[in-house]
Amino acid sequence: MKKMFIAFAMFMSCSLMMWANGVVPTRFDERMDLMAVIWRMAGAREYNQCKISPYVNSVDSTFKPFASHKAIALAKRYMKKNGVGYDAVASMAAHLKLTDEGTLTIDEDIASDIDDRWSTAMQKEFVTALNDFYKMTEFHKWFVENEPIQKQCLDAFSEISSNIDLDWFAQTFDSGDANFNIILCPLAEMNNYGISTRHSDGTNVLSPVISCSKYDNGSISYESEEVLPIVIHEFCHAYCNPIIDKRWNSIAKKAEEAFRIKKRILSQQAYVTAKIMMYETLVRTSVIRYEQQHNSNTDVWQLIDKEEELGFILVADILKAWNQNLASNPGDILAESINNFSTEAYCAKVAEEEKRSVNYTCNITDGEKNVASGDFTFTITFDRQMELWSRHTWQAVPGKRW
């Protein structure tokens, strides 16, 4: 399998792909900020990690006086009883329509695919309270007053939004009807959501919510190497999730087996079902494939190993099958690659790895007292070579001994 990946990488380095740098429209969205503010006031951890202090100060000073408002009380109740948080908040924002008269309604032009944590009764109840909050707090006025900070974010993000190969999605997933745009939301910091909506005319609007900003001494920035793969990841959800849904019955058994093996680590990341794991697995595989096709220096095995550490143990097999069928849609190879995965062989490999040892020595005698100051040597010896990307803060040193 490794030879196959190396051969593919060599092919890519010999035929560098070029792509049109069409700028993806990027904006702040008043509906998203409105929902984020309410969930922040309701105490949602995922909406209380913004790093841009002027924005945070503006939010808190403006809206804390309304902490007892019904919209915030409902948000607290929905979080506790229905698990409405994270992407469910962004999903509601995407399905809202803000009229010229300043009224919020559920947009009837969008297919009713709002996150299923929102019941119809909850939607109706919440929108009524939301309208009152919007008017009472003069939310639109606050949103407009913060345009200078928004502009800083948009300017900082422009390098990323102009360097996305949109044609790749149509070519990879055999779909060309998508309308791409990006919503920046610093209030969602440390979380990003792959939101998409299908309109009555058939248009599929992909509008991922992206945070990932850095703030230092008044300067806002977005690191391209870190953020661009996240944007690709969130765009991929709009394509990958339906592929999994369509083929779920044919892969469910093996997916459930894989999920049981890694349930603990996956659940810690909020991937709490086998189907959610598979959404993420196919998306993460797609991002690696994008990296392969746009950067000849991509270390495929490093990316695969990192995904396996996070519990996504099917990535390598899907990517292998996909690379062996370069022209295929991932859905065409999905069932075969997953169903050929041996959970028994994987568990045996893990058990063997756990037997491997690490030894250490030091030139200080164990238990020695009154040790004089000076240079000491602490040697760690592994039973194999260390990887250059190993997660430590020391200088990477290949070999068995450090």
How would you describe each model-predicted region?
Residues 21-103, 310-319, 327, 331:
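N-terminal mature-domain "stem" immediately C-terminal to a signal peptide or N-terminal signal-anchor/transmembrane
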Residues 108-113, 193-225:
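Active-site scaffold of zinc-dependent metalloenzymes
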Residues 1-23:
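Bacterial Sec-dependent N-terminal signal peptides
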Residues 241-268:
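Post-HEXXH active-site segment of zinc metalloproteases
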